[in-house]
Amino acid sequence: MQNTKLIIVFTLLALALTACGGAPVALPSTYPDAAVQVEVIALNHAPIRSAVEEVEALAAEYGEKVGYTRYDFDTDVGVAFAEKYGIDGHTPIAIYINGEDEFEIDGVATKFYSFPQDGGTGIVASGTWTMDDLRTVLDQ
């Protein structure tokens, strides 16, 4: 019985580390001298990780034209970044392009905050942006 409890505890611990783990998120800019800088701050766990990876891949398509920096809310650097922009609470992801997170796209104010459209969870709602919106801003 005691061994069974230990196995259960270690299994739950391993699952928790897998869900919240991954690479530490506080990466330096890919191209710090690029005219366009994309800064992403996100929670480093499963529900949002795929959106962060999509943003990272999109920024990489622009090569040296776009710098990309990623911050983790759970690091000192991430906390400082969040404080700089007044982000608090349970924010899955916020994206800043040259220090701005809201842009007008086709006459509509679009804020790169929270999950992309249709990407939310039962706990956190989707945002109002799409990857196509992000591409539109980066193309300008």
Q: What are the language-model segments listed below?
A:
Residues L27-Y62:
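Local sequence-structure signature of Cys/Sec-based thiol-disulfide redox active-site neighborhoods
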Residues E64-G78:
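Thiol-based oxidoreductase modules, predominantly thioredoxin-like and allied folds used
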Residues G21-A23:
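Bacterial signal peptide processing site
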Residues V40-A46, T69-R70, F81, D118-T128:
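Second-shell loop/turn segments in exported
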Residues I97-Q140:
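Non-catalytic, surface beta->alpha helical segment in thiol-disulfide oxidoreductase systems
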Residues L15-A19:
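C-terminal motif of bacterial Sec signal peptides marking the signal peptidase cleavage site
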Residues M1-I8:
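Bacterial N-terminal signal peptides that target proteins for export
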Residues V79-A109:
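Structural alpha/beta surface segment adjacent to cysteine/selenocysteine redox centers
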